[in-house]
């Protein structure tokens, strides 16, 4: 008998279904029935080492067709996704853009 639930199990409990996962990241989706949209959360590896976590409406793209609309995460959701980043080895403390 297991005592603790995995991060993926906890994310599933709050509606996030894992779409894919590999060494370069993971992707999750959940449907918001109140506002009728799909929220997607991506954890992606970047060659720079500044790996990213982004949450957005998967179907809504901006007028210039260069990006999606951001969807916020609660503190609990962010905590779970940060744990997932750490599990994948994609959590880094590097911040900002060098230049």
Segments (PLM) and residue ranges:
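Amphipathic alpha-helical segments
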Residues: 2-20
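Intrinsically disordered, low-complexity regulatory regions enriched in serine/threonine/proline
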Residues: 2-6, 24-40, 44-99
């Amino acid at each position: 008998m297991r005592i603790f639930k995995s991060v993926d199990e906890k994310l599933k409990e709050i509606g996030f279904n894992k779409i894919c996962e590999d060494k370069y990241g993971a992707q999750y989706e959940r449907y918001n029935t109140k506002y009728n949209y799909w929220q997607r959360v991506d954890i992606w590896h970047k060659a720079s080492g500044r790996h990213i976590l982004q949450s957005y409406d998967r179907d809504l793209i901006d007028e210039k067709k260069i990006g999606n609309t951001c969807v916020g995460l609660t503190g609990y959701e962010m905590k779970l996704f940060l744990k997932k980043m750490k599990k994948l080895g994609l959590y880094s403390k590097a911040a900002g853009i060098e230049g």
